[in-house]
């Protein structure tokens, strides 16, 4: 998982999820697209 100051969708399968005031990007196709804002 990448920790970045700004997260964005990297492909059309990526989803933006808010959990406990943390913005995350999850991808069902490519696990390398996982990101967390921090």
Swiss-Prot record:
Which InterPro entries does its entry note?
Ribosomal_bL36 (IPR000473), Ribosomal_bL36_sp (IPR035977)
Any one of the GO CC terms: ribonucleoprotein complex
Q: Name one GO biological process term.
A: translation
SUPFAM superfamilies linked to this entry:
Ribosomal protein L36 (SSF57840)
Any GO molecular function: structural constituent of ribosome
Keywords recorded for this protein, A-Z: Ribonucleoprotein, Ribosomal protein
Keyword presence, Ligase: no
Q: Which Pfam families match?
A: Ribosomal_L36
Q: Note the NCBIfam families from the entry.
A: rpmJ_bact
Q: Which family does it belong to?
A: Belongs to the bacterial ribosomal protein bL36 family.
Q: Which PANTHER family match?
A: 50S RIBOSOMAL PROTEIN L36, CHLOROPLASTIC (PTHR42888), LARGE RIBOSOMAL SUBUNIT PROTEIN BL36C (PTHR42888:SF1)
Name the chain's protein: Large ribosomal subunit protein bL36
Gene name for this UniProt entry: rpmJ
């Amino acid at each position: 998982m990448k920790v970045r100051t700004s997260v964005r969708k990297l492909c059309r399968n990526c989803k933006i999820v808010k959990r406990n005031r943390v913005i995350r990007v999850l991808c069902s196709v490519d696990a390398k697209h996982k990101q967390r804002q921090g």
